[in-house]
Amino acid sequence: MRKISRILLLFFLLSTSIFGNEPLITKEKAPLSVALPLLKSIDQYAIIIGSGPTHMYAFIDPVCPRSREFVSMIVESAKMQERYTYHFFYYELTRFHTKNMIGTIYNATRPLEMMKTIMVDEKEVSVMTTFSSDITKEINAISDVAEKLDIYKRPYLFVVKPQKGGQ
């Protein structure tokens, strides 16, 4: 009986180590041929940092620790800003309940500065609870595209390299 229980335990441990390494979420990213027209349709709402030839579209949440690390890394690196043009879109991770904060960022006179204050400096700001129809339209347009692209984590990135031959 002891031998059988040891064999079962060994089998259990082996199976959990093999199957435990499988990713929990196995989603395919939308191909760029599908994603790029959708991203271009909301580009007017992007907060842009950098001036490089390679464009990086990023969906971020203002409270998400990974998004904050990513934005801080870019803001603090002139080299990254020379290599890439970053197009940031705020898209709420529902567990953080940041829709009002996102609206506050987009409603700011200088959204880039507000973004840095919240995400890089990690300062508290007064969060608005009502927004103009234009801000609501921006947030909804970004959410619609994010849902079509099945964005499920933050930051979620699309990289568009410059075409060879200057085209």
Model-predicted regions and their roles:
Residues 96-107:
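Short Fe-S-cluster ligation motifs
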Residues 10-16:
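Sec-dependent N-terminal signal peptides of Gram-positive bacterial secreted proteins and lipoproteins
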Residues 16-97, 128-162:
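Extracytoplasmic thiol/disulfide redox context detector
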Residues 2-10:
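Sec-dependent signal peptide recognition
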